[in-house]
Amino acid sequence: MATIALGIPTINQAELLQPLLERYSENWYGRHTYIIDNGNQKIDPVGSKQRIVKMSYNLGVAGSWNLLCRTIFGFGYSHIAILNDDIYWNKNADDIESYIEQNPADFYVGLGQWCCFVLPYETYEKVGMFDDKFVNAYFEDNDYEYRMKLLGLSVHKNEFFNPDEYKQSQSIRKDPSLNVNFESNKMRYIEKWGGFPREEKFTKPFEKIIAY
C-alpha cells in the first residue's frame, strides 16, 4: 500500500507559500508536510502535521530534496511528493496514493519541468541521493533522470502531476543571484556525463574516453 507525504523547499517565497499551506493542510490531512526554509522567512505551520525546518544556510535544491527524502522516508512513508514553492498542486493525498497503486512506476512527474514529482523510497534507495554539487539550482533534476535511465527505471509522465497554479521561477526573479551558478552547473553536467541533457555519452560519472 502506497503512503505519501509532502515536501517543499523554499528560500524567498513566503508570501506565496503561506496561503498554500492552508490549502495543503486540507488536501494532505493526516500526512506530514515538511518545509525546508533556506531563507529564514516568516512561515507558520498550519495544523499538527506541518513542520517548518529553518536552515542557517541555503542547502540548494538538491540538498533540500535530500533532506526532505531522509526525513519523510525516515517516518516510514513509501513515497514523497516534492513541490516548488511557487506552484499549487490541487490533489488529495488519498487520490495520489490510489493513482500510484493503479499505475506502478519508479518515478512520477508532470508533462513539464520537475516542479512537481513523486519519488518512491525504493527508487531513492537504488539511485541514491541527489547530487548537491550542482550548486543552488539547475541540472540536479537532469542528473537524477539520467541516472534513473542508466538503471533502466521507469518514469511515469502524466498531466495528473501538472500543477494547477504555476508562477515560473519566482524565486530567481526576486533574487537573480540564485541563478549565478547556472553556467558552472551546466559545465559540471557536461564533464560528468559527456554532453548536455539528452546528449549524454558517459555511462559512468566523469568517465574518460582514452584514445590509443
Residue map of PLM features:
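Hydrophobic targeting segments
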Residues: 2-8, 24, 32-35
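Short, well-formed alpha-helical segments that are part of the catalytic scaffolds
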Residues: 13-27
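C-terminal catalytic/acceptor-binding lobe
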Residues: 136-212
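A conserved acidic beta->alpha catalytic loop
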Residues: 29, 35-45, 86-88
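Conserved donor-nucleotide/metal-binding helix-loop-beta segment in metal-dependent transferases, i.e.
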Residues: 92-110
